[in-house]
């Protein structure tokens, strides 16, 4: 027998609310028992299209490192950038003049590092870094020397606890830093690190240094008449830098008298 959609006894009607309709596996419908009050206060706990209210801020913007030097000075580190990086020279930045002119100084501040490598200053924000600009110094009310001192102090503290990897193959030896923290290449700025590499590698030959990317510092001892090692070292630096997300330099350097200079010997094949 066919079902009559207008017969209430058969579960259907086209008049009023159809409470008795068979919804199968669907959830039972919800019906309003009153018209909505559009002027009523919004219920903060009521979800809207799956939206979850944002967490309540526990601090003001003025307390973030970008605005508070007392917090920033514990988080700032030096970092290398490729030669040719467009930045504002830190030695030319004048805090008093920048404060007086009111102009924006959004370009990253850069120092000249060893072998002409640019050095910027980065705020460690965890998943990313904030590169320090002149606007930051103006907001913090500090000079370039304060920034440099804090960054080197933090790098030194971190480096003192960071491990080294030592690899030996016959008479060949590599010492490298690849912690993943992001400050490995910058370790070469520290006198203690230069002393360490000189002690470990210096007695056996020339000390080759590679800074292919931000996360790697590699050093090797080049013994006399081992040109093959120099070529292999140069190839590694070239390939690593070419595939890096944050490359620094494809050149091979060496330590001479405690100074980082460009290696004038064998180049990559």
Predicted segments with their positions:
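Extended, low-hydrophobicity segments enriched in charged/polar residues
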Residues: 9, 16, 20, 27-169
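A contiguous, surface-oriented mixed alpha/beta subdomain in the mid-to-C-terminal portion of proteins
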Residues: 94-255, 260-267
């Amino acid at each position: 027998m066919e079902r009559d959609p207008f017969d209430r006894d058969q579960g259907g009607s086209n008049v009023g609310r159809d409470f008795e309709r068979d919804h199968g596996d669907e959830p039972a419908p919800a019906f309003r028992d009153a018209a909505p009050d559009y002027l009523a206060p919004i219920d903060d706990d009521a979800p809207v299209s799956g939206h979850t209210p944002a967490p309540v801020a526990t601090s003001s913007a003025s307390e973030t490192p970008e605005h508070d030097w007392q917090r920033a000075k514990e988080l700032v580190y030096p970092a290398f950038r490729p030669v040719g990086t467009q930045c504002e020279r830190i030695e030319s930045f004048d805090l008093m003049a920048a404060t007086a002119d009111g102009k924006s100084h959004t370009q990253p501040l850069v120092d000249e590092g060893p072998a002409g490598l640019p050095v910027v200053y980065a705020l460690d924000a965890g998943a990313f870094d904030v590169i320090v600009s002149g606007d930051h110094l103006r907001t913090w009310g500090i000079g370039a020397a304060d920034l440099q001192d804090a960054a080197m102090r933090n790098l030194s503290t971190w480096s003192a606890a960071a491990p080294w990897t030592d690899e030996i193959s016959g008479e060949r030896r590599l010492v490298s830093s690849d912690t993943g923290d992001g400050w490995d290449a910058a370790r070469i700025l520290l006198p203690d690190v230069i002393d360490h590499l000189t002690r470990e590698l210096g007695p056996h030959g020339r000390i080759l240094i590679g800074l292919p990317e931000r996360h790697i510092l590699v050093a090797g001892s080049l013994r006399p008449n081992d040109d093959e090692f120099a070529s292999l070292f140069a190839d590694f630096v070239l390939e690593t830098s070419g595939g890096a997300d944050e490359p620094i330099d494809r050149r091979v350097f060496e330590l001479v008298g405690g100074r980082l200079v460009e290696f004038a010997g064998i180049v990559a094949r």
